[in-house]
Amino acid sequence: MRPGLRRGARIELTFLVESWMKPHLEGLVKHPLYATWAMVYHMETVSRALLAPYLESHEEAVGGAVLVKHLGPAGVRARVRV
């Protein structure tokens, strides 16, 4: 691993919620809100973007845990920051 990664490092991703980010759950959920699985996807995406500059070409990263907390609903076309 390349040097430089420090505790507390941050990166942000801002995007608009799209319809593909809604819950699908075999038709059981119909609300037009940002889904938990999409939130985890975006959390994993920003985590990888933060780590990528420090990985050597032969290295890979594996997550150990994800803690998700919805602070408020976000509808389709809402701006979200992860």
How would you describe each model-predicted region?
Residues 37-39:
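A short mixed-secondary-structure module that forms the rim of ligand-binding clefts
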Residues 1-35:
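Catalytic strand-loop segment that frames the active site of acyl-thioester-processing enzymes
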Residues 47-81:
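Hydrophobic beta-strand-centered segment that forms part of the acyl-chain substrate-binding groove
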